[in-house]
Each structure stands twice: as structure tokens, then as C-alpha cells.
Amino acid sequence: MTNEEPLPKKVRLSETDFKVMARDELILRWKQYEAYVQALEGKYTDLNSNDVTGLRESEEKLKQQQQESARRENILVMRLATKEQEMQECTTQIQYLKQVQQPSVAQLRSTMVDPAINLFFLKMKGELEQTKDKLEQAQNELSAWKFTPDSQTGKKLMAKCRMLIQENQELGRQLSQGRIAQLEAELALQKKYSEELKSSQDELNDFIIQLDEEVEGMQSTILVLQQQLKETRQQLAQYQQQQSQASAPSTSRTTSSEPVDQAEVTSKDCSRLANGPSNGSSSRQRTSGSGFHREGSTPEDDFPSSSGNGNKASNSSEERTGRGGSSYINPLSAGYESVDSPTGSENSLTHHSNDTDSSHDPQEEKAVSGKGNRTVGSRHVQNGLDSSVNVQGAVL
């Protein structure tokens, strides 16, 4: 019997019904009653089956809860045991401390008999009496200074107190105002000082930038001078080779004129080296070239010549060195050491060439004396170039 089928009605029969009703009707009522009983039994069985499963689940849950509660109980019992043990330990410690803190009669007697403790108690007693006396005196003074609102002394004292309070407030304002003014003045000074520092820093930055530009210019000038010096040395080496090839016992004036032309070329290169990257006028280059024609030449050791010409050259070079060697060395070295800019190098070289032209004699333009002069002048030129290179290296 399913839950969807309606439950049959319960049949109720009394004793009168049994007596009055017919047999067929009684059988029908009995069948209805049996159907009702069967429906109830089916429902009961269904309920019993559901209740059994639910009871089993609930039983398992209860068992788990019982186990969990038993475990918790054990844990709590252990905690309780530990707490009780701790409490016992605490009680024992408390009893021990009480016993320690409660001195015995013997200890009390020993403390009372101790002279140091007796002295300490006597001092405490004296100080207590002094404080009591001071307290009484202060109370008496306080009671003497008490006054009523109508007393003149109280009014005067209150007025004096108000006046003192006002004076204190005014003094505080003055002090605060003076401090603020001082701080403002210091702040203005600091601002002015910071502005001056800023301006000086800007000037220094501009000066440093200018110095960097000048250093770059000097470096480019030095590079050009080094290149020109290298070219000049190469030309001097070529000139020495030509001189060594051309110097022979059968030399004539024609062969001596060729070195003069080569010396002019060398002097032009030297003047260009001294002038640096600046493009000077042709007249200045000619002037400096004539000056270097008398000075710039190769060293004396690189000139192989005959004995006669060598003696003449050595005599003329000694005479030239004795008369104006110092005048050659100082102007030339000074001229090369003063190469700070293209304009300065051009002016110094022009001045040096004018001095050298004015110091020469017309008789020194001879072939033999010219060779000696070129020898000495080449030494001076090399010394001046080396000194100028050293000076520029120190500048870098």
C-alpha cells in the first residue's frame, strides 16, 4: 500500500449492529475492517523501517559524540590534575613564604637587642617629632593668614597678585616678541647668504664652463702643434739626409745654396709650428722664416763635411756662439713657452724674428758662416721645441 492511496475508513460496530445487521453486510464490514488493518500494518512496517535506519544513524552519531566527550573528559581530567598539582605547589610556596615572613620570637628579640637597629629607630623617632613640629607651625601660620572678604589685607594681597600676574604676562610677551624678531633677522641673513652663495655658484659654473672651452681649445692647439712638430722633424731628417749626401770634398757654392733654400722651407715650417692653428699674414711668415733661416737647422753632428769646411764652420760657430748664443736660446725658448693661444704664439714668434733679424750682421750671410749658424740655430730650435712640448704637457 503506497502513500498515495487513501487510507480506508475505520469500521465501527457495536453490539446492536451485530444483532440487527445481516450476514452479508457484516462480512462486507469485516472486509473493510481487514483492509483498514492491513493499511495500518503496512504503514507501521514502513515507519519501522525508516525508524530503524534513523535510529542506527543516530546511534552511530551518539557513539562518536560519546567517544569525543570521553576524549575531552580525559583531557580535562589531565588538565585538572595538572592544575591541582600547581595549586598544591602554590599552597606550599605560600605557606613557606608565610613562615619566612613571620619572624619568630627569637628573631624579634635579636632585632630589638641589636644596637644598630635601636639607633635607626631613635633617628626615625626624632625626625618624626621634627616633622610634627613643622606641621603644627605651618598650620598656625596658615590660620593666621586667613582673612575674610571684607578685610583690607586680603584685598591688598589680591590686588598685588593681579598686578604681578599682569607683569609676568607682559614680560612673557616681550620675550616672545624679541625672540621672534631675532629669528626673523637671522632668517633674512640666511636667505641673503644663500642668495650670495647661489650667485657665486653660478659664476663658478660659468667660469668652469669657460675654462673647459679654453682647455678644449688648448688641446686642439697642442694637437696641431704636435702634428706640425712631427712634420718639421721629418723635414729636418730629410734635410739631414740630403746634406749628408750633398756634403763632399768637391762641394761648391751651388751645393751650399741648396741648403739655404731648404733652410728657408724649414724656417717656414717652424714659423707655422710656432704660429699654431692661426693663419698669420704672409709678411709675418716671411719675417719669421728669415729669422729661422739663420737659426733653424740640423745638429752639427749630422753634417759630414771636409776638413777645411769643418774648421771654418767650427770657428764661425764658436764665434757666433760666443757673441749671441745666449740671445738665441732665451728668446726662442721664451717664445715657445709662451704659446698659450694662436694669437699669442703669432705675436711671440714675430717679436722673436724681429729680434733675431736686428741682431745679425751682414757678413754672416756667407756660405761657411751660414752653415755654422744653421748648426747652432738648429740646436736652439730643437731645445725650444722640446721645452714648448714639455710646457704644453704640463698644462694638460
UniProtKB/Swiss-Prot annotation:
Pfam families in alphabetical order: Wtap (PF17098)
Modified residues (N-acetylmethionine): M1
Record PTM Phosphoserine, positions in chain: S14, S297, S305, S306, S341, S388
Modification Phosphothreonine, positions: T350
Keywords: Acetylation, Cell cycle, Cytoplasm, Developmental protein, mRNA processing, mRNA splicing, Nucleus, Phosphoprotein
InterPro entries: WTAP
Biased composition annotated in UniProt, kind: Low complexity: 240-257, 278-291, 305-316
UniProt key word Aminoacyl-tRNA synthetase: no
Loss of function: phenotype: Death at E6.5 due to defects in cell proliferation.
Polar residues: bias regions: 340-351, 380-396
Presence of keyword Manganese: no
Primary site of residence: nucleus
PANTHER family: PRE-MRNA-SPLICING REGULATOR WTAP, WILMS' TUMOR 1-ASSOCIATING PROTEIN
Family: Belongs to the fl(2)d family.
Protein name, per record: Pre-mRNA-splicing regulator WTAP
Gene giving rise to this polypeptide: Wtap
